[in-house]
Regions:
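C-terminal amphipathic alpha-helical interaction region
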Residues: 213-281, 285
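Short, charged/polar, low-complexity loop and linker segments
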Residues: 42-47, 167-172, 246-254
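Sequence-structural signature of the catalytic-core scaffold of metal-dependent phosphohydrolases
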Residues: 1-114, 127
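Substrate-recognition/cap regions that form aromatic- and gly/pro-loop-enriched pockets
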Residues: 139-240
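Hard-cation-handling environments
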Residues: 99-152, 170
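Zn2+-dependent metallopeptidase catalytic domains
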Residues: 132, 207-208, 279-283
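Divalent metal-coordination and catalytic microenvironments
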Residues: 64, 189, 267
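Secondary-structure capping and boundary motifs in well-ordered enzyme cores
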Residues: 51-59, 115-119, 123, 152-160, ...
Length: 285
């Protein structure tokens, strides 16, 4: 469980100005306020200091970097967002020295095809680099306080990795057809969240009526939205508000916080396709 938490920093409730004062992964927050007791207990059982990563997180992060940076460009070529010629021109123009030139030359000459060879050889070198960094900085990584990713520095393979990310940002993700998909997704999420927000506007007593299966004509629309919520998330909400949490000054504050979490967890658990279908349903499209 600790290895799944990429950003173990907790929210800055009393010092919002603290955001941006750190760099790298320490500047991001990955633990909800409600999850703090669980992560604290997890850290105590594993010997992790507050805000420190589990060592396996660094390996998982490196694996993500290796797989996605290559897959994004390969997928862009397969979908004809970018031609192989355009990709090669961008990579050659990066001027990463002999390592890049040799990697491209051998991949183009390979009988298996460009991407299989490119992916295999770059992955091999990146895995070796990650392993070397992990061993070299073993003590800092085991402490959970290592501030960087494993794949950093001036090593040729790391420089190529950075170049692949830059090419993806500038020549794939900024293409009109890709941005159109992002706008469609943004509109869908915004529409779903805006519609379900009416459940947050309800007084606690009215939301309790929905939980009890009651509600008059004034809750006509809210009741139908409520019926679409996941039973699993509703169960988690009921458990969270069943007993008083001393971290909240008021019971109403606790209830509303977990109602927000209920909707947030429900929406964030949607697949892209489901979120779009939900948006169309709620919009009458």
């Amino acid at each position: 469980m600790a290895a799944l938490c990429k950003y173990p920093q907790q929210p800055l409730l009393h010092n919002p100005q603290g955001y941006g004062q750190h760099h790298g992964w320490t500047s991001k927050r990955g633990i909800f306020f409600s999850e703090q007791p669980l992560y604290r207990a997890l850290g105590q059982s594993l010997g992790l200091a507050p805000g420190c990563r589990h060592p396996l997180v660094y390996i998982m992060e490196a694996a993500d970097d290796i797989s996605y940076c290559i897959a994004d460009l390969e997928d862009a070529v397969d979908r004809r967002i970018l031609t192989q010629g355009e990709l090669l021109a961008a990579l050659r123009g990066a001027d990463e020295g002999d390592y890049m030139a040799t990697l491209l030359e051998e991949a183009l000459a390979s009988e298996r095809g460009f991407f299989p060879h490119f992916r295999q050889h770059l992955t091999r070198d990146l895995v070796a680099l990650a392993a070397h960094t992990y061993v070299s900085d073993h003590e800092a990584i085991l402490s959970g306080a290592y501030p960087r990713a494993l794949l950093h520095g001036q090593a040729p393979a790391a420089q190529v990795l950075d170049t692949l990310k830059q090419v993806a940002r500038e020549q794939v993700f900024m293409r009109p057809e890709v941005e159109a998909l992002e706008l469609e997704g943004y509109a869908a999420l915004r529409g779903v969240l805006s519609t379900y927000a009416c459940l947050l506007a309800l007084p606690a007593a009215q939301f309790e009526r929905l939980l009890a299966g009651n509600g008059g004509s004034e809750l006509f629309f809210a009741r139908r939205l409520f019926h679409r919520l996941s039973a699993r998330h509703l169960k988690a909400y009921r458990l969270a508000v069943a007993s008083r949490d001393p971290r909240f000054d008021y019971g109403a504050e606790q209830e509303w916080y977990y109602r927000v979490r209920l909707l947030l967890d429900y929406v964030s658990g949607m697949t892209d396709t489901y979120a779009l279908e939900e948006f169309r349903l709620l919009s009458g499209i």
